């Protein structure tokens, strides 16, 4: 197993002051993302490009309009092919929102150790419509913008929970690969964020060299 300091240097990134926030991003970069985590929940909606998403030891190979559920404190990173533009929606959600039942999908993803929501064409169109309406409402300055934006966010999350909790998504074992040792290391880090997580400590605990290059899972 090849691990490096970059693997161990998991850090908290991003700050969220609102109940939720939506981003629509498109870029093309050679940046390599390190493992990191957030204090809030995150939904990633992959639109186009070539990308894999690593979450807690699983690497999901993404198809257009795949949705990923990233629980707060879950250690993760995207792996992007820089040869083509990478487009996605990112939805950040506070853990203390008034609608706690809408966070069930994140807990269930954690319980199942499975984070991918791959939709059939009908559900895909439904979710796309709500998502684009949500984006347009959030950017507008029309009357009732905040109420409509909140309503569309709630719609999106209700349908997302229905789809995931009721297993209406397409399950494909070939959509991900799994590395049990990396999963074990990440789980240890995730549950001991306030402890000594130095490269030396983790290397000794898991019998891996701190001098070797980053493994791609």
Where are the regions a protein language model picked out?
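Generic protein-terminus/edge-of-domain signal
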Residues: 1-67, 74, 82, 99-111
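Amphipathic alpha-helical segments enriched in hydrophobic/aromatic residues interleaved with Lys/Arg
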Residues: 106-155, 159, 187
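Ligand-binding loop in jelly-roll beta-barrel domains
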Residues: 73-98
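N-terminal positioning helix adjacent to the helix-turn-helix/winged-helix DNA-binding module
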Residues: 177-185
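Short, locally clustered residues in the helix-turn-helix/winged-helix DNA-binding domain
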Residues: 47, 161, 190, 194
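Linker/hinge segments immediately adjacent to helix-turn-helix/homeobox DNA-binding domains
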Residues: 157-170
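Basic/polar phosphate-binding segments, predominantly the helix-turn-helix DNA-binding elements
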Residues: 188-217
């Amino acid at each position: 197993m090849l691990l490096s300091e970059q693997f161990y240097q998991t850090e908290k990134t991003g700050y969220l002051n609102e109940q939720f926030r939506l981003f629509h991003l498109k870029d093309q970069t050679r940046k390599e993302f390190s493992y990191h985590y957030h204090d809030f929940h995150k939904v990633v909606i992959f639109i186009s490009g070539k990308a894999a998403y690593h979450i807690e030891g699983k690497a999901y190979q993404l198809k257009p309009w795949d949705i990923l559920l990233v629980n707060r404190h879950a250690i993760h990173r995207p792996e992007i092919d820089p040869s083509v533009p990478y487009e996605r929606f990112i939805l950040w959600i506070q853990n203390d929102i008034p609608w706690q039942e809408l966070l069930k999908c994140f807990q269930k993803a954690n319980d199942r150790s499975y984070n991918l929501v791959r939709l059939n064409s009908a559900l895909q169109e439904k979710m796309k419509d709500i998502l684009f309406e949500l984006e347009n409402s959030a950017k507008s300055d029309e009357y009732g913008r905040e109420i409509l934006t909140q309503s569309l966010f709630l719609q999106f999350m209700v349908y997302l929970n229905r789809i995931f909790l009721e297993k209406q998504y397409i399950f494909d074992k070939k959509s991900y690969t799994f590395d049990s040792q990396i999963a074990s290391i990440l789980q240890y880090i995730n549950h001991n964020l306030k402890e000594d997580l130095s490269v030396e400590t983790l290397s000794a605990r898991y019998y891996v060299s701190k001098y070797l290059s980053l493994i791609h899972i």
